[in-house]
Amino acid sequence: MNCSIKARRRMSMKLIKMEKVKDGKYLKNYELTYRNKAGKEKTYEIVSRKELSGIEDIGQKVSGLSIAAVNGDKLLLLREFRMGVNKIVYNLCAGMIEEGESLEQCIRRELYEETGLQVKRIIDILPASYAAVAISDTKTSIVFVEAEGEFEDHTSDNEWIEAGFYTKEEVRELLKTAEFSSRAQIIAYFFARGVL
């Protein structure tokens, strides 16, 4: 397929209306009405962490981050109970950027709150990407850090987290048997193969 055909198909999908249908404490539900490539209307549902005042606001704001932390030759993974799936999964340290907080402040706060660890060095910060593109406009950054310190629990009563550092061999075994969030799984995969 040549580029001009691809471009015409992309341009033929047009968002014509957005309506908020629910305003929850943490999530806002919206119905988007599109005109599809056949010229028919298609209603699509999304959730957003941010208030969207118009179509132009969709996917514009970075709401949080995920932290890929290492200590020497070990990767930080969290065993975390996630209410959305009603089970414990392996996850990265992650969280939402608070009002008035910089990305670097959020990195340090979230790592400390969820693990008790400190940021020794920020290695890299990737540009924000969509966290769940099929259902949400939420954008988060993936951050790579070196962490140090002792594990401590500073989480709220509504969180259950066990943090630990894992070797490449341990991570390889977890990838065969444990359930992961998608971002944690891809970070773990590359770490276990020596790419990270």
What are the residue ranges of the model-derived segments?
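Short, Lys/Arg-enriched N-terminal segments with co-localized hydrophobic residues
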Residues: 2-12
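Nudix hydrolase/Nudix homology domain
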Residues: 5, 16-17, 84-89, 95, ...
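Short amphipathic beta-strand and strand-loop transition segments with alternating hydrophobic
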Residues: 12-23
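Acidic, metal-coordinating catalytic segment for phosphate/diphosphate chemistry
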Residues: 24-66
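Conserved Nudix-box catalytic region and its N-terminal flanking loop in Nudix hydrolases
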Residues: 61-109
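Short glycine-rich loop/turn motifs
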Residues: 64-66, 140-142, 160
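Active-site segment of metal-dependent pyrophosphate-handling enzymes
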Residues: 70-72, 81-83, 91, 112, ...
